[in-house]
Structures are given as structure tokens and as C-alpha cells.
Amino acid sequence: MMTDGYSSKISEIEIANLLSLNPDTDSESRASSSNVQAPKPAAVLVPLIYDPPNAKNPGWQILYTRRTDSVQDHKGQVSFPGGRADPGDNYPTGTALREAYEEIGLRPSDVRILGQMPPFLTITNYLVTPVIGVIPWPYNLTIQPNEVSRVFTIPMDWMAKAENYEIKQRKFPPSAQIPPQFQNIQVIYYRQY
């Protein structure tokens, strides 16, 4: 049990202040200049949970979902609740909150939005904006069984420890029809928690 980690010392206000710094818009400019077809807007909710010092895993934790093996895309992958923007969404926050409600039953009124991270372009031509929000915990989630197989949390302190991850270059074979900006990218691989 880690009680002196960084995540147990940073406050909600400090997280919000970090998110409000000038965002990197480089991914948006790459998206507009590198694709024939405009990227599709999407958003994910990055749900943060704060466990008090007397909890089993004190400090900040991130809530993840694991997709079912029956969904059309990204079968069995670990993800955040989210998806493609719908007309009428207050994009990106409204999209992230709507998707979180649909996938895990997280009511939008229960999420305190702290800010958002810069959008990033995916290999499938989505421009995804991560929206950061704090949720009360414990919370009675209602999992959409057609999309989500499970929900779990991982402490941020664990994720920050270098022995828990490695950074590798991801390379695709020349035969893969991959846009140039994805040919040789750095990927963070975490060991099993």
C-alpha cells in the first residue's frame, strides 16, 4: 500500500489547473493536413476517483472499462467510456458524458468536469478529445453488457512507477496500409496490474 505517492498529494484544483494550460493543438493540425477525409469527432471520459488516506489504495485512481468480445470494433480492449460525437452533443464534454452514461450508467450530473486534454488522432481517423472528470466513489454503476465486460480502477501512483511500464516503438509491416504519421509511434505498454 502506497501512502506517500504523488497522486495522493495533488488536489482536484491542481489537476484542473494543469489541464487549463495551453493545449497542444498539433494533433489537430496533423489531422487536417494528413487525411483526405476529415477525422470524425469523438470523446472519452477519463473518470478519476479519489480514495482517502485510510482507504485500501489511497490517492487518485483511474476508472477503466474492458470492451466485450462481441462489439464490432476494439474487441476485448481496455478503454475509457466514450465514442463518436452525435449531432446535438455539446462536444466534447457532452459526448463523453453521454457515452459514459450509455456504457456504464454514470449520470452526467454526478461528474465534476476538471477540463480536457488535447485531442489526438487515431489510426481509424477519429479525433478523440479526453475529458477529465471526478466521480464519487463508491458508485453504483450499471454496465451495458453488450459493450462492456467489466469496470476496474488502477491507482495513478502505480501507473507512474517506471517498473510497471515500458515504452516501445510500434512498427507496422510495409504491406500494411497505414498513414505515415502512424508508421513508427511510441506506445506505452503496462504490465498487468
Language model features by range: what are they?
Residues M1-F80, R84-T142, D157, Q169-Y193:
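N-terminal leader/linker segments that precede catalytic domains of diphosphate-processing enzymes
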Residues P145-N146:
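Short, conserved loop/helix-junction motifs that constitute active-site signature segments
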Residues V151:
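Amphipathic alpha-helical interface segments
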Residues I154:
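A conserved hydrophobic position in a structured secondary element of the catalytic/binding core
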